[in-house]
Amino acid sequence: MYNIGFTTVTFRKKSRREICQIASENDIKYIEWGSDVHLPPNDINALCDVLSLQEEFGLTAVSYGTYYRLGEENYSLWESITDTANAIGAKIIRIWQGTKASADVNESEFLSMVDETRVLADIASQKGLTVAFEFHNGTNNDNGKSSVEFLKAVNKQNVKTYWQPFSTDDDINNLKAVIHYLACVHIFEWNENGKRYSLKHGSKKWQEIFKIIDESKTNPYLIMEFVKHDSKRQLTKDLKHLRVLTRD
């Protein structure tokens, strides 16, 4: 059985309470809190609100979706981020692997990011937290090969990766490459130009994806992200179809 949830960045314009109500309406127990709008680090009022809402709606924080990027080397900020994740009960902190595509990262930059990641991981480990990289274009974590190369170089048990589709022919190979380092899957259906569709539109592809994940026995969290028209109704439809696809 998969642990299915969604991320608050799905509805950046909605309040924290509205998001928790949507989770409740869809029988969702797991949530990823984004740090850009709904839970900034060092915002005690937002934190207190999140803790109250999680208790009221019976929600468990899966991860803290931050926008910390390797290269910042801002360890005081990182301490605040880990404190926030720890406070809400999240075991995963999502960060970004630099600001350059893997093809543009030189050896010195690569090694510097490895060193920074080790420091971040050690701080996170003291609080029982896992660091997981967003799988995204425009970062070093933009394909399976570069992702695994970096994770092996870091060589920390509490450093993993997300995976998400790029709507290209490389999606399946990328997934297979990172499968044993997988913490979470961001789920959405769109084309290479960013046009959004219902999850059902990509059923055949997602069936293959879940077959690979099933066989790996890695059991990552499945986190719905973007939906067509930013629609609450579309999220409900996509979650229903996701449960069909995963037999959940």
Can you annotate each of these PLM segments?
Residues 43-49, 75-81, 106-118, 144-148, ...:
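Charged helix-capping and loop-helix junction motifs
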Residues 197-222:
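P-loop/Walker A phosphate-binding loop and immediately adjacent motor/lid segment at beta-alpha junctions
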Residues 9-16, 34-46, 67-76, 101-105, ...:
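Acidic-and-aromatic substrate-binding clefts and catalytic sites of carbohydrate-active enzymes
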Residues 184, 220-227:
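Conserved active-site loop/cleft motifs that coordinate metal ions or position small ligands
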Residues 30, 61-64, 121-206:
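Acidic/histidine-rich catalytic cores of soluble enzymes
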Residues 90-105, 127-137:
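Active-site groove signature of glycoside hydrolases
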